[in-house]
Amino acid sequence: MTLPEPAATVIKASGRTARPGVEGMSKHNDLLKELGYAAQSARTVDALMDTIVQRLHDTMTRYNWVGFYLIDKARPATLVLGPHVGSFEPHESISLDRGLCGAAATTKKTVVVNDVAKDPRYLRGSELVKSEMVVPVFSRAALFGEIDINSYFANTFTPEEQQFVEACAALVASYLEKPR
């Protein structure tokens, strides 16, 4: 069985391969392959995003809340909650000038905060959250939305974790850009 093209491209472009003794990398690669297959068979982008948040939440034990925030077509300066899973109620919408999600959207760069108590941009969703990562998702160079991950553990997000979630975002971008 061959790796689906979007996942193969993402893994190759990221330079990520499992190395002996690096269990996390292997777990990431296995999950990326699984999500690549999901991207090939998903009927809608919402179905793909649902699969991504569920699998990240189920597989990555320190990912306590995983969700997508999407650019609101009616209010382009606002992110609205998309597919999500986790143990607390998230913000329904976030202005692009607020929070870590707003920072990732306006800078168009991944934001990783391994101690949210030390970052004044953090918008509290739960007192239990200790670290957060927000990864932008682009479609044809325009911001489509972002993957937001909250953890109840400080220092959850390593550079490898960041690359992994950026690869998941690239799968969504690839899905959005494929001809229909």
Where are these regions (language model features)?
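Signal-transmission linkers at sensory-effector interfaces
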Residues: T2-S41
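Amphipathic alpha-helical regulatory segments at dimerization interfaces
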Residues: E34-S41, D50-T59, A103, L171, ...
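Helix-loop-beta substructure at the N-terminus of cytosolic sensory domains
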Residues: S41-V80
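Short hydrophobic/aromatic beta-strand element in the GNAT-like acyltransferase core
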Residues: W65, V134, E146
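Regulatory sensory and allosteric helical modules in signal-transduction proteins
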Residues: L70-E127
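A short, aliphatic-rich beta-strand micro-motif
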Residues: S131-S139
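Sensory-domain boundary capping and coupling elements
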Residues: F138-S151
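Juxtadomain coupling helices with adjacent low-complexity linkers
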Residues: S151-R180
